[in-house]
Amino acid sequence: MSYQQQQCKQPCQPPPVCPTPKCPEPCPPPKCPEPCPPPKCPQPCPPQQCQQKYPPVTPSPPCQSKYPPKSK
């Protein structure tokens, strides 16, 4: 028997079945970047004069302008 014949006698092995590729694990959620430090507050404005802080109260308009007369 030649060497080739002996080899042929061995039952052929079926080709190895490739296992179905496993889905890669989902990516971990991206790490949030560290939140920005709160912006530094600018120095508070010097206190304004009262007049600017509290504007003068405007007198309420007369009733006529509030409720115009109905057009006939």
Swiss-Prot record:
Q: Where in the cell is it found?
A: Secreted; Secreted, Extracellular space; Cytoplasmic vesicle, Secretory vesicle
Gene Ontology terms describing biological process = antibacterial humoral response; defense response to Gram-positive bacterium; host-mediated regulation of intestinal microbiota composition
This entry's comment on induction and repression of expression is: During squamous differentiation of epidermal keratinocytes.
Q: What is its main location?
A: secreted
The record's account of tissue expression is: Expressed in intestine; selectively expressed in goblet cells.
PTM description: Forms five pairs of intrachain disulfide bonds.
Against InterPro entries, the record matches this protein to: SPRR2 (IPR029142)
Q: What does this protein do?
A: Gut bactericidal protein that selectively kills Gram-positive bacteria by binding to negatively charged lipids on bacterial membranes, leading to bacterial membrane permeabilization and disruption. Specifically binds lipids bearing negatively charged headgroups, such as phosphatidic acid, phosphatidylserine (PS), cardiolipin (CL), and phosphatidylinositol phosphates, but not to zwitterionic or neutral lipids. Induced by type-2 cytokines in response to helminth infection and is required to protect against helminth-induced bacterial invasion of intestinal tissue.
Q: What is this protein called?
A: Small proline-rich protein 2A
Gene source species: Homo sapiens (Human)
Originating gene: SPRR2A
